[in-house]
Design a protein with these regions (language model features):
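Terminal accessory/targeting
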Residues: 2-11, 21-169
Length: 169
């Protein structure tokens, strides 16, 4: 990432929440401490996937190590963000995604993370490709801008929302 982007990441997370899985989490935090802990460099914040929603999927994501990762971050004064919103079953329909988004935005506390999975084209190898295209279309729409305004939510770059010394609950 750093070679291609020519900068350290603003945040660290993992596809399908692997950053908090036992076995991966320990390697990740070791690398983070080695690369950013002692040097005084700005520390990338960690996404703790503690899903602030009801349902089986939300409970499963949270159970996959969110508490352990958050405990490590707190013990090491590492910047991190929890809760996470945006978990759903990729059900069809643009109006369904819009309703989900309205609910997530309405319950979003300060310094929460909202995950999304957009793509601007279908990929036949991706089982959630249709949902990705629907998300992309919605996120580009005036309806999304209106939903943000109605909920009083402002999008920003992660490093601007969470100062390196700040910890979200």
């Amino acid at each position: 990432f750093e070679v291609q982007w020519r900068a350290a990441p603003d945040h660290v997370d993992g596809h399908q929440h692997v950053q908090q899985f036992a076995g991966i989490r320990e390697v990740l935090v070791s690398v983070l401490q080695r690369r950013y802990g002692a040097s005084g460099a700005a520390r990338p914040w960690l996404r703790v996937s503690r899903v602030a929603q009801v349902g089986v999927k939300a409970r499963a994501i949270s159970a996959w190590g969110a508490q352990a990762l958050q405990d490590w971050a707190r013990a090491n004064s590492w910047p991190h963000v929890a809760p996470l919103l945006g978990a759903y079953n990729f059900d069809p329909g643009a109006s369904t995604y819009a309703r989900h988004m309205a609910q997530w935005l309405a319950q979003m506390p300060a310094q929460a993370t909202l995950m999304c999975h957009p793509a601007n084209a279908l990929d036949a190898r991706d089982p959630i490709a249709p949902a990705r295209v629907r998300e992309h279309a919605y996120l580009r729409s005036d309806a999304f801008a209106d939903a943000l305004a109605q909920a009083g939510v402002q999008l920003c770059r992660g490093r601007d929302a969470l100062a390196p010394s700040t910890e979200a609950p």
